[in-house]
Amino acid sequence: MDWLAKYWWILVLVFLVGVLLNVIKDLKRIDHKKFLANKPELPPHRDFNDKWDDEDDWPKKDQSKK
């Protein structure tokens, strides 16, 4: 088991290469053109910033200075 203490990093590299090869293989199976042709419509984006628009603390440009 002395070799394992010395060369543990080689096992980690072999594992990472295996993961990388599996990721590449799986990504090759994805048909991006088919997905883009059939992608669902996104609902309109709802943000709630309009609630704070009335509470604006900045002075209005139209008001004259007092």
Curated annotation (Swiss-Prot):
Main localisation: membrane
Coiled coil: none
Region feature (Disordered): 39-66
Record's keyword terms, sorted: Cell membrane, Membrane, Transmembrane, Transmembrane helix
Pfam family, one: UPF0370
One GO cellular component term: plasma membrane
Membrane topology qualifier: Single-pass membrane protein
Source superkingdom: Bacteria
The keyword Nucleotide-binding belongs to this UniProt entry's keyword annotation: no
Composition bias, Basic and acidic residues: 42-51
Annotated compartments: Cell membrane
Residues passing through the membrane, by range: 4-24
Family: Belongs to the UPF0370 family.
NCBIfam families, A to Z: PRK13664.1 (NF010185)
Protein name: UPF0370 protein YpfN
Species name: Salmonella arizonae (strain ATCC BAA-731 / CDC346-86 / RSK2980)
Highest classification ranks of the organism: Bacteria, Pseudomonadati, Pseudomonadota, Gammaproteobacteria, Enterobacterales
Gene name tied to this protein: ypfN
